[in-house]
Amino acid sequence: MEVSQAASGTDGVRERRGSFEAGRRNQDEAPQSGMNGLPKHSYWLDLWLFILFDLALFVFVYLLP
């Protein structure tokens, strides 16, 4: 009888912890900016900057004497 009460007590703790973590997860989500739903940081900009930097570095190394 005591074992079943202890087991049910741990399940209650797990349920409470799970609901707390779920609530905390919702608060940690980044808010969406604008109406189009894009994140605040655009990774397309990072991609294009990387490509441009890569091309500039290639041209610089290619033209070295």
From Swiss-Prot:
Tell me what gene encodes this.
Arln
Q: What does this protein do?
A: Inhibits the activity of the calcium ATPases ATP2A2/SERCA2 and ATP2A3/SERCA3 by decreasing their apparent affinity for Ca(2+).
Locate the transmembrane regions by residue number.
Answer: 44-64
Q: Where in the cell is it found?
A: Endoplasmic reticulum membrane
Q: Which residues carry this modification: Phosphoserine?
A: S19
- Renumbered residue ranges of the record's region Disordered: 1-36
The entry's protein name is Sarcoplasmic/endoplasmic reticulum calcium ATPase regulator ARLN
> Keywords on this record?
Acetylation, Endoplasmic reticulum, Membrane, Phosphoprotein, Transmembrane, Transmembrane helix
Q: How does it sit in the membrane?
A: Single-pass membrane protein
Where, per the database record, does this protein carry N-acetylmethionine?
M1
One GO cellular-component annotation of the UniProt record comes to: endoplasmic reticulum membrane
**PANTHER family named in the record:** CHROMOSOME 4 OPEN READING FRAME 3 (PTHR37367:SF1)
| Taxonomic lineage | Eukaryota, Metazoa, Chordata, Craniata, Vertebrata
UniProt main location, coarse: endoplasmic reticulum
Q: State the InterPro entries in the record.
A: ALN
Q: Where is the composition biased (Basic and acidic residues)?
A: 12-28
Q: Which Pfam families match?
A: ALN (PF17696)
Complex and partners: Homooligomer. Can also form heterooligomers with other sarcoplasmic/endoplasmic reticulum calcium ATPase (SERCA) regulators ERLN, PLN, SLN and STRIT1/DWORF. Monomer. Interacts as a monomer with ATP2A2/SERCA2; the interaction results in inhibition of ATP2A2 Ca(2+) affinity.
